[in-house]
Amino acid sequence: MNVFNRDIDREPTRAEAERALALLRDWAGAASDGEIETLDPALSALCPGRAVSDYPTLSRTYPDGFEADAAYKASLPDLQNGPASLIRGARRQIQHVGISNFRLPIRFHTRENGDLTLETSVTGTVSLEAEKKGINMSRIMRSFYAHAERTFSFQVIEAALASYKADLESFDARIMMCFSFPMKMRSLRSGLDGFQYYDFALELVETAGVPLKIMHLDYVYSSTCPCSLELSEHARRERGQLATPHSQRSVARISVALEPGGDCLWFEDLIDLCRKAVPTETQVMVKREDEQAFAELNAANPIFVEDAARLFAEALLTDPRIGDFRVVASHQESLHSHDAVSVLTEGATFAADSLDPKLFSTLVHGR
């Protein structure tokens, strides 16, 4: 009987080494990568076709009990706060860098003194100096969440912006909050109520310490072409021919800068201004008598896209809480295969020599 003794007091011969090597190769040839790594990763060199790695063997089991203490956190690399030598590309100031479309429930106050909790998409950005590599974007979210339990107003948005601007040591900053605001709307004749949803955005921009508060609203309405209406009436009158004018769903994006120190412009107030300017808002609850009333309402208010821009402007100019503004209107034609569009700006805030190439394509109903 042969007994293996670990304490061999002589050097193995070459023949013994060759036999041992052959045995290891036979075993390694049938073993898995995991089995080889468990025994000794260096054995990969003995197997034809297996890659040899000098990388240490790492655990593949998630460490549930591991806790990162202060010392460990301090040891973590932070490339975004690295030296200027890490900057890639031109060393230029970046006007806006941050995060977009992080969502959370936010509580908003209504004109009737109630609160609504609405899903809100938040964009937060700051300026970045030319000599800084980058920002820690999670700080924007953390700063915003610190205020998320409060009922939001522009004052709360200002506090959130100040928090992350200080945390990121930036000069300029911006917050935009997008949400759909529900408001009850009564039908034209049947007396039924339904919820109309309005896409709003609140924007706070601070540049060189000066805040600018902006409210955006997408208002959806029906536009009946005045020319088509007259042509239809001509066919009826002159030839006894039944004809109908073309009308279409239309969207106006109303952007208003709020006057500093002015009274609160409620969401409902801006909606009311739009309804006053263009009363042919699309309906929610509709019975036959409402549909007939809507046809009559459109006939009483035919409107070109140029008219729409000017009518909205006329209403906005009457409100002392509103400073500069912009109206972007899109009549999504039922006659033509293209849309009719217009842009009207008042004041320097929204004046621009160039338009976003995708601007008009974003004027759609719903999200």
Give short role names for the model-derived ranges.
Residues 2-367:
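N-terminal intrinsically disordered, cationic/polar leader segments
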